[in-house]
Amino acid sequence: MVSNTKKLELIKSFGKNEKDSGSIEAQIAILTEDIESLKLHFEKNKKDLHSRRGFIAKINHRKKLLAYLRKNKFTSYASLIEKLNIRK
């Protein structure tokens, strides 16, 4: 899980203002940080299948948000991908 201070930091850098947690860019940034922290958890705990279900749900949610952003705001999508280093 992402700590509250880290979430606020991500919202400030990717949101439109410091309280804009609903923008797509901020949501994707928070989900990406959460996914990265869960990757470390699954390296240590390979048999934690119940948490893996939530992990896959987060990945799918981020995937849908990225598809929406790519379809509607491609320039924002491209800059976000580069900043978060998601795709190569």
From Swiss-Prot:
SMART domains: Ribosomal_S15. Transmembrane segments: none annotated. InterPro entries: Ribosomal_uS15, Ribosomal_uS15_bac-type, uS15_NS1_RNA-bd_sf. The keyword Lipoprotein does not apply. GO terms for cellular component: cytosolic small ribosomal subunit. The keyword Ribosomal protein applies. CDD domains: Ribosomal_S15p_S13e (cd00353). Part of the 30S ribosomal subunit. Forms a bridge to the 50S subunit in the 70S ribosome, contacting the 23S rRNA. This is Small ribosomal subunit protein uS15. The gene is rpsO.
